[in-house]
Amino acid sequence: MPIVRYLAMLSVLALLTAPSHAQDGAIKIEKFTHSEWTRGIFSEAVTVMGIGNAKFVYLAGVGAEDENGPRGNVRHHGNFLEQCRYAYDKVKRVLAHHGASLRDAVKVTTYITDLRHRLTLGQCVKDTWGDVAFPTNTLIGVGALAFPEMIIEVDVTAIVAAK
């Protein structure tokens, strides 16, 4: 079984069977908010530790929302490439905060409001990831995202050695 498939299955199993808090030190789940406007609404990142020597990092719905601005303040209105770059810049910052990098990503889900942007998405991905092997990715066309000005959003799962 390829390692990526094994890790993805292990990741899903961990989410389905893990409690919402640590029990007997076996599994530790921590939930994080990195933007002021998301506090009390949802967790932008969740880490799961205690499954072997792995720390799973799950990032939810990273887009071009200004993490330092008011709720719904989206940067680069109408500019797909710049929204993509901004989203992946946030992904890199949040992964780094949790001890991970793009090299540790094993799964990406990309949501875009217009599939005609897929070639521009490809360029953004090449520019962002450089020589890093890109993980599995599912591209999904959607009618809308969290805010009307958003045209791209990504979910990322990464796995690193627990410390």
Predicted regions and their residues:
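N-terminal presequence-like segments and the immediate start of the first folded domain
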Residues: 6, 10-89, 93-107, 113-163
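Positively charged n-region of N-terminal signal peptides that target proteins for export
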Residues: 1-5
